[in-house]
Amino acid sequence: DPWMRNHMPKITMYQSGGAFEQKEDAPFVQSFKKAFHDVTDTEIKVVGSPAGCDSRLWKRIAGAQVFQYGPGNQEQCHSINEYVDVEEFYKAILVYAHFILTWAQR
């Protein structure tokens, strides 16, 4: 297209984070695992996420310690008819609250 050739779009990248890794033995992660166990009386399995999320920006750009956790299951996340079980939601609230309180008291 002649017009497009003479009026190329200008693309500006305002953020980029790329992939990231958070070591499982990091104190932040270990503290969360303990909080999860304290609330649920079960161990949480640490796995990688196949989806993109803002954690990459916090880790790679801001240098923050991060992890991803939420109610529901990874296989169903961001799919058609996505939903979260109410009990899972309530459990996540308790886990978050316990983690925040115990991490803040370190």
Give the label of every model feature segment.
Residues D1-R106:
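Metal-dependent amide/peptide-bond hydrolase catalytic core
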